[in-house]
Amino acid sequence: MKIGIIGAMEPEVAHLVESMENSTSTTIAGIEFVAGQLAGQEVIVTRSGIGKVTASIATTLLIEKYAPDAIINTGSAGGFADDLAIGDIVISSEVRHHDVDVTAFGYEIGQMAQQPAAFLPDAKLVAAAQKAVASLGEVKAIEGLICTGDSFICDPVRTKTMLENFPTMAACEMEAAAIAQVCHQFAVPFVVIRSLSDNANDDSAVDFDEYIIKAGLHSALMVIALIKQL
């Protein structure tokens, strides 16, 4: 099985790349693709860059050049679930855009025109992620809605509006829905694994800088444990 793994920033992919064997690196359009073996599987680890546009470019290039059988999006996120702490993990039950609004044409809030309102992860990948949770010890993981937008959320007013629009949201970040939308259009199975780096509040910027390495490592360990289940 060939697995594509996408993270936005260096701390989100560093442990994965360090753990690979027989790896080779290729850079296309400023995006690095590292191909090799990880946990007994053929993988391509991609550092996409931050935001929905770069994530879309990276996902499209990954699919077109390497033809992966599945894609895992890994990295950090801001937490919205009361029972999760920094470093805990959210496994996608569905993925939505939180900054899209074409409701004037009859679409749901967050739904891009001519696209589904929610992008659903592959059931087998989610099941593998659930099995992988047990190997992480004290780290807690839940399934939940992950929402995506091109903003770092640290404003209580913005947070309140987002929760009004998406009351079941467990985490928000800046790439997953773009990756999921590309996977949807190419019919490539996907799952999103995100570890919390902050709680999407006034302290988020400080928390993010302090905890991004921890969040990136936890998410990477979860991805490796997931791959071992495939």
Curated annotation (Swiss-Prot):
* Keywords, alphabetical: Amino-acid biosynthesis, Hydrolase, Methionine biosynthesis
Which residues constitute the catalytic centre? 12 (proton acceptor), 198 (proton donor)
- Which pathway does the record list? Amino-acid biosynthesis; L-methionine biosynthesis via salvage pathway; S-methyl-5-thio-alpha-D-ribose 1-phosphate from S-methyl-5'-thioadenosine (hydrolase route): step 1/2
Q: Name one GO biological process term.
A: L-methionine salvage from methylthioadenosine
Which catalytic reaction applies to this protein? S-adenosyl-L-homocysteine + H2O = S-(5-deoxy-D-ribos-5-yl)-L-homocysteine + adenine; S-methyl-5'-thioadenosine + H2O = 5-(methylsulfanyl)-D-ribose + adenine; 5'-deoxyadenosine + H2O = 5-deoxy-D-ribose + adenine
Pfam family, any one? PNP_UDP_1
Keyword Cell division set for record: no
The protein's matches in InterPro entries, at most eight in alphabetical order, are given as: MTA_SAH_Nsdase (IPR010049), Nucleoside_phosphorylase_d (IPR000845), Nucleoside_phosphorylase_sf (IPR035994)
Entry's EC annotation: 3.2.2.9
The residues that hold substrate are 78, 153, 174-175
* GO MF, one example: methylthioadenosine nucleosidase activity
Instruction: Please provide one cellular component term from the Gene Ontology annotations of this protein.
Output: cytosol
Record flagged with keyword Amino-acid biosynthesis: yes
Signal sequence, start to end:
none
Family assignment from sequence similarity: Belongs to the PNP/UDP phosphorylase family. MtnN subfamily.
Q: What does this protein do?
A: Catalyzes the irreversible cleavage of the glycosidic bond in both 5'-methylthioadenosine (MTA) and S-adenosylhomocysteine (SAH/AdoHcy) to adenine and the corresponding thioribose, 5'-methylthioribose and S-ribosylhomocysteine, respectively. Also cleaves 5'-deoxyadenosine, a toxic by-product of radical S-adenosylmethionine (SAM) enzymes, into 5-deoxyribose and adenine.
Q: What is this protein called?
A: 5'-methylthioadenosine/S-adenosylhomocysteine nucleosidase
What is the organism field in this record? Shewanella piezotolerans (strain WP3 / JCM 13877)
**Gene responsible for this protein:** mtnN
